[in-house]
Amino acid sequence: MRVLFVYKEKNGDNLFVPVIRTRLSVHGIEAISSVDEFWNPSRSYDIIHIHWPEEVVGWNVNDVDIDKRLETRLRYFKEKGSRVYYTCHNLSPHYGSPLHQACYRVVERMADCMVHLGNYSLGKMAGLYPDCRHVLIPHPIYLGAYDDTLTREAAREYWGIDRRTFVVTAFGKFRRRDEVWMTLKAFFSLPRRKKLLLAPRMLPGSYPKPLLSVIRCLLHLLGVRTENNERIISDEDLPYYFAVSDVVFIQRCVILNSGVVPMAFLFG
């Protein structure tokens, strides 16, 4: 069996797809990650698996006919005998682009099988697309993807954090203003005298650099270490954020799931 994950693997990106691809390979399934292979295939595939429609069409797409092109391409694969799988990470794109919205609907409509990470999307999407097969598969815990043997002491030495400091980490990218306010309110309400919030991707990247610097400095005085939300966290640094933490705070308000939850379990 040959599976195409329509996804471009990049350093510092979410390892969700690479982890699954590696595990499939262990079981003798040929699994490939590529966006180019979707638009210009060099071979046939038994399964075309889409995780994020934005990965397929581009995160900054401006082609008004992109949804039609996407449907044509999916129809091409289905006519060749491929089955279309879709993992429902989000019900809608994070930033609400009408072009991306249209592509989400195309993928949902064309999917032969929809994989859900939780019961909420399964119940909702099964009602909307009853002819599609719907399965629930829990989020993987990234086993083997990172060094999970780090001690808290080693991580604190790495970040230069005193062992008596209570550390809260809000790791994921902040996409909404209410996520920022919820996190800061929770942190400042914490009844600890010596505390630190690590939120490496909290500040909007659209802010001018001088303003970002001022905000970052002010927050630092209040015990918050943060950067802009476009920052890429290296695979080498990632384990240290979790190993150093007393609490991993999940700042999601409306998003279906967060990979930070299983990642936190990986690091204990």
What residues fall within each predicted segment?
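Short donor-sugar binding/catalytic loops of nucleotide-sugar-dependent glycosyltransferases
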Residues: 171-175, 202-204, 254-255
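Acidic donor-binding loop of glycosyltransferase active sites
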Residues: 239-257, 266
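Nucleotide-activated donor-binding/catalytic signature segment of Leloir-type glycosyltransferases, i.e.
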Residues: 209-244
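A short helix/loop element that forms part of the nucleotide-sugar donor recognition site in Leloir-type
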Residues: 146-161
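Conserved donor-binding/catalytic core segment of Leloir-type glycosyltransferases
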Residues: 161-178, 187, 197
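Membrane-proximal helix-turn-helix segments that form the acceptor-binding/catalytic region
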Residues: 68-82, 97-114
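Donor nucleotide-sugar binding/catalytic pocket of nucleotide-sugar-dependent glycosyltransferases
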Residues: 112-126, 130-147
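An anion/phosphate-binding loop that grips the pyrophosphate of nucleotide cofactors and donors
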Residues: 45, 111, 245
